[in-house]
Amino acid sequence: MDDEYSKKAKREGYLARSVYKLIEINEKFSLFSSGNVLDIGASPGSFSQYAYKKLKRGILVSVDINDIGLRYDDNFYFIKGDIFLDDTVFKINTFKPYSLVISDVAPKTTGNRLVDTSNSFNLSMRIIDLSLEVLLKKGNLLVKVFQGGDEMQIFKKFEKYFKFVKKIRPKAVRKNSFEIYFLGKSFGK
């Protein structure tokens, strides 16, 4: 489906329209600072493309169970793996600490909203738990979540660990989508 964001992504050389969600959030909340960035669920790669452009110092580590179509010569590492597996977590930990963790990952959808939101919840909680292990003090975390399940539990977890917490629905989210983003800034209160 070619909407205005899809066409804009093609024109500007991004791999997916989802990049405009990250751009909008970053313009409002200044996610990037010096330090390493971790992109969990990086495929197809548009979040990583933008993150790489925004690197001030440090490296970008992109993780996904699928390959992504990005290769950069410097300051970029791709880890093909599942964040639920120890081997992948070990590789992620090799580059810690991170000043920012971003995730636009979504589970494979079934069409059953209850199942999909439950799977999104489990995936989001895993990303948060992993982020708590690898984030720098005062680091930032951005995670996509499907609405309609236990997202308030996720929000409360953010509030426990971050000084600033915000629920965001960027303009680039499709009208019929039930995705939102949770942002936590200044880890470690």
Swiss-Prot record:
<comment type="function">
    <text>Specifically methylates the uridine in position 2552 of 23S rRNA at the 2'-O position of the ribose in the fully assembled 50S ribosomal subunit.</text>
</comment>
<dbReference type="InterPro" id="IPR029063">
    <property type="entry name" value="SAM-dependent_MTases_sf"/>
</dbReference>
<dbReference type="InterPro" id="IPR015507">
    <property type="entry name" value="rRNA-MeTfrase_E"/>
</dbReference>
<keyword id="KW-0808">Transferase</keyword>
<protein>
    <recommendedName>
        <fullName>Ribosomal RNA large subunit methyltransferase E</fullName>
        <ecNumber>2.1.1.166</ecNumber>
    </recommendedName>
</protein>
<dbReference type="InterPro" id="IPR050082">
    <property type="entry name" value="RNA_methyltr_RlmE"/>
</dbReference>
<feature type="active site" description="Proton acceptor">
    <location>
        <position position="144"/>
    </location>
</feature>
<dbReference type="Pfam" id="PF01728">
    <property type="entry name" value="FtsJ"/>
</dbReference>
<keyword id="KW-0963">Cytoplasm</keyword>
<comment type="similarity">
    <text>Belongs to the class I-like SAM-binding methyltransferase superfamily. RNA methyltransferase RlmE family.</text>
</comment>
<feature type="binding site">
    <location>
        <position position="104"/>
    </location>
    <ligand>
        <name>S-adenosyl-L-methionine</name>
    </ligand>
</feature>
<feature type="binding site">
    <location>
        <position position="64"/>
    </location>
    <ligand>
        <name>S-adenosyl-L-methionine</name>
    </ligand>
</feature>
<feature type="binding site">
    <location>
        <position position="47"/>
    </location>
    <ligand>
        <name>S-adenosyl-L-methionine</name>
    </ligand>
</feature>
<dbReference type="InterPro" id="IPR002877">
    <property type="entry name" value="RNA_MeTrfase_FtsJ_dom"/>
</dbReference>
<feature type="binding site">
    <location>
        <position position="82"/>
    </location>
    <ligand>
        <name>S-adenosyl-L-methionine</name>
    </ligand>
</feature>
<keyword id="KW-0949">S-adenosyl-L-methionine</keyword>
<keyword id="KW-0489">Methyltransferase</keyword>
<dbReference type="GO" id="GO:0008650">
    <property type="term" value="F:rRNA (uridine-2'-O-)-methyltransferase activity"/>
</dbReference>
<dbReference type="GO" id="GO:0005737">
    <property type="term" value="C:cytoplasm"/>
</dbReference>
<feature type="binding site">
    <location>
        <position position="45"/>
    </location>
    <ligand>
        <name>S-adenosyl-L-methionine</name>
    </ligand>
</feature>
<keyword id="KW-0698">rRNA processing</keyword>
